[in-house]
Amino acid sequence: MAQHFSLAACDVVGFDLDHTLCRYNLPESAPLIYNSFARFLVKEKGYDKELLTVTPEDWDFCCKGLALDLEDGTFIKLAENGTVLRASHGTKMMTPDMLAEAYGKKEWKYFVSDTGMPSHPGKYYFYDNYFDLPGALLCARVADSLTKQNSGQKTFDFWKDIVAGIQHNFKMSAFKAYRFTTAWNSSSSCAIHIEKKNCGLYFPEIKRDPGKYLHSCPESVRNWLQQLKSAGKILLLITSSHSDYCKLLCEYTLGDDFADLFDIVITNALKPGFFSHSPSQRPFYTLKDDEEQESLPSLDKPGWYSQGNSAHLYELLKKMTSKPKPKVVYFGDSMHSDIFPASHYSHWETVLILEELRGEEGEKPEEAEPLEKKGKYEFLNGKIQRTPWFIHGLLTKSVLTALLQFQVLKQLQHPTMTIAEM
């Protein structure tokens, strides 16, 4: 991997969507995500109604780089060498003595020192982006509730209910208001079945009032994307969001003609598997009316696709650029889903979009209050304030500032640094 990054040297520029090109209004979207899951757990799975009440102080628990041990409900923060820096059982922080007794100076049980990455992904969940963080708070409060109800319960099995909540709120069919199917009976008459979709709380709310939860993209970013295309760059949009939700986000943030900005759009990419899985494991699918159709043995032309893999994509990029080794850079906000897999498996250059670099509106870095004094979500009169975490300037010329270059190179050299230091 090159130690010096030049955007001008790249043939292909790819982007994630959520929290990268699409900036969310986090003080509104975070409670929406939390409530989407909490209501499902209370209504469908019988969890304590106290989960529905969140105080401003509760949000201070949210912190990037937490790993949840799915068996015992413990959240840990790892050092680069795999030792545990701090931990909490649910939301209850362990004292230094408790931490020493539970973990000592040994590597965490799921950490593999030769790769520098945790193993056994079915045993833990890693929270490294703002879409997931409300779920971390919910899981911690679930662990608190179960511990209280069951007199110090040590092991848990609530993760299956969290997964069910994810499926309910974010499955591919959840975005659609209705699904129409037809069936012919023996008398050759047709019956039309109308199945109500629009599941959960999240998608209906976003569709009802997108301006409450999303920020439009600055014109400077649109201009920059157009300049990249004019300079002969191939532009990619690779998102794990489904096709219909991707359209809603892009139309609101980039405009109705957003598709003209990109040569290839890939939705439901199922990252990080898009980068790590083989073509046979993750083929591309065509789309019709936002629903997946036939699988493709290869990717032969630009367009809009679903799922897929970076290997077949790269073969297409070779044809489009007429180069045996086109250079690709990918912008994303998640170390787990974007930065590490794109760099490690696909050998792409990567740029981490780190919202925290901005600080407060109008403040110089040296004047800003230290981050350790602040939670990730600021409140006033019981309501999360509109703190400007994302800097779209990172997607313009300042993407090549010394600060971001330093951050990117450090991440490429030490892919677990986010766990310990973010």
Predicted segment positions?
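HAD-like aspartate-dependent phosphatase fold
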Residues: 1-422
